[in-house]
Amino acid sequence: MDKFALERRIAGLELVHRVGLALSAERNHNRLIERILVEAKELCHADGGTVYLVNEKNDTLEFAIMLNDSMRTALGGTTGRPIELPPIPIRAADGTPNHNNVATYVASSKQTVNIEDAYAVANFDFSGTKAFDVRNKYRSRSFLTLPMLNNGDEVIGVLQLINARDRVTGEVMNFGALEQEIVEALASQAAIALDNQMLIQQQRRLMEAFIQMIAAAIDAKSPYTGGHCERVPVVTEMLTRAACDAREGPFQQFDLTDDEWYELRIAAWLHDCGKVTTPVHVMDKSTKLETICDRIDIVKMRFEVLRRDAMLRHVEDGGKLGDAELVRQLTALQEDMEFLERANVGGETMSPADQQRVREIGARRIFVDGRDRPLLSDDDVENLCIMRGTLTDAERLVINGHMVQTIRMLEALPFPRDLRRVPEYAGGHHETMDGCGYPKGLFAGDMSIPARIMAIADVFEALTAQDRPYKKGKSLSETMEIMARMKRDHHLDPDLMDLFVRSGVYRRYAERYLPPGLVDAVDEAAILAIRPAQLSLPEIQDRRKRWADFLPRYRPLVGNVLGALSVPVPGGH
């Protein structure tokens, strides 16, 4: 080898090395494929080229990108223009390798094919190429087709270059042995870079599918959560996109990289993963007396005993008090039972007078199993006296504690560096701007923008949800009125709420997910006009104290509730 050829070879390999480093740093799949072809064309000064990728499922070669300089053609890759050519079968209909096409031959044989003139070969079918040339007044002559082999010696694609050109005259020439050697080295490095990227993408898809499976299982665990875990990511991404697109205001500098978008999506899908530890009988508690069953039926049986006793006394006394008194007693029992049934639903705020009536009814005595006992147990009375909703304070703490479990579960996972904020994003959607949320009592300044976005998404989805058996979904205007009050009261970030309204995210979501009859007019001006009072934040040590105080209260209570089912306390020792 003469000195000039040696220098060219060394220079070419050095270029391959530099290109290989650049390829290994490229994170975008389409850009990587495009760069592989562009660099290969440059190394050989080729007029055009194609990258095919193997579709293992269909056993075909699929067109990934096509470039041709003299025809000014660019399809696939990052161009946004699709390649409307069908995939090429790697095997014939009888299962034998398809050796008629040069690209599929290379994919099957794992050997490079260097053709001086496509019109002069007989062992490959170039009829399609010739027809293309006629239509486009082009002349395809020299072809260099190389397999792209990964570390496992598996073909993941094929690189094909067309019409090498003299760098001085521009005339079409053959691909020389040196050019072939250099491009083979490039194809090898490119295949490894591409394979690594494809493996990362496959791992990401697997992780996303697994996470979505967990979210679907949580939604399926209880009809009371419906499709919440599936829809919160939708609202989260819509509002985040609006923040990234903002060109003025508080979010004009806000943006996310591809990795940060992935991190946010993972967090949104996992935001309620702690609910896997929440007892179903607490999460699905639709009436005040419901546990594994609704204990109102047991109370009804006790009232039947009282009715029986009243009628027996009437018979035993010979009717001395008269039928009217019996009717009065039975009517009073019926009224008290109906009152307890209404109280059990928890649909309205319970007044102190109604709570007192529950206690008086509960204090009555009943004789069962040879024992004299109160009509209602202390636990019955406590539950029936719940002022709002159906949960006791202890049960509410257990429900709220799903955030503790979410944070603990996620913080225990060995997330890579680009996913390290998943616990923070997912664990903050019940926090409020004024520090009155749970479980950590964070303030606005303690929370990232994505965490605050997720808080809005969680509230909005919960209020508009139509698939909850215990409530009707609210109209769009009702939902936004509630969220406007939450903005005023420092529960939701006011700047993000304004963006939520101005960008129209709330309406686009509603038009997609809500029945048309509930998508009504919203007074946007009134919401935007709300200006919350200035917050006065306590010292950081006081803010941290809320988290420290929450755990000691939470763990014994969740232990008591779960203990009834002989379930170990999550995170307990």
What are the language-model segments listed below?
Residues M1-E7, F126, R139, E154-I156, ...:
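Regulatory loop-to-helix N-cap segments in sensory/regulatory domains
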Residues A25-G77, G95-V102, S109, T225-C229, ...:
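Helix-loop-beta substructure at the N-terminus of cytosolic sensory domains
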Residues M1-R35, E42-L43, I65, L199-M213, ...:
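Signal-transmission linkers at sensory-effector interfaces
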Residues R141-G157:
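A short, aliphatic-rich beta-strand micro-motif
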Residues T50-P97, A120-V121, L159, L289-R302, ...:
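GAF sensory/regulatory domain recognition
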Residues M1-K3, S108-T112, V158-L161, E181-Q203, ...:
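Signal-transmission/dimerization alpha-helices at domain junctions
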Residues M71-R139, F367, N383-I386, T392-D393, ...:
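Regulatory sensory and allosteric helical modules in signal-transduction proteins
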Residues N174-L178, I214, D284-D309, F367, ...:
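Divalent-cation-assisted or electrostatically stabilized phosphate/pyrophosphate-binding catalytic cores
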